[in-house]
Amino acid sequence: MAEANPVGMPLDPNNKIEPNPVPNEPNRSNSYAKLLGELQYVANATRPDISYAVNKLAAYTANPSLLHYGILKRILRYLAGTRQLGITYQKHDTDPGNNLFHGFADAAFANADDLKSTTGYVFIASGGAITWKLKKQTIIAMSTTESEYVALSEAGREAFWL
């Protein structure tokens, strides 16, 4: 993958990710799960920018298709092209306000597959992310406003402990 052509985004917005219609092949599922687990570690530890793509693919671990493998390879190509990105923290002595943390939350309303919204939030301190989360909401929100409130509630619970 060192000489792979880099891409600008981990997921192609024009491709719809769908379940595999072909029965499961155990060897394929095992290698897919291994690579996906390694990418989940990277997403959780240092690269929150791939969290959505990795979480989306995790839903197909039991029966991955060649398309799902192709998307995993695309994420690797994205990582290869963005090696310079990472989390950095900076000390701001002159302006104490810069050392405070900031939080951002958002929601994506009603996934086409199961109508559940997705919550995402990130908290930043000294210029770097200190905690973040991306997860499917457990309820089916009836409006975008409701899904945003759920996202803010999740972020608020996390902020309470920071």
Could you say what each language-model-derived stretch is?
Residues 1-162:
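Long, low-complexity, charge-biased intrinsically disordered regions
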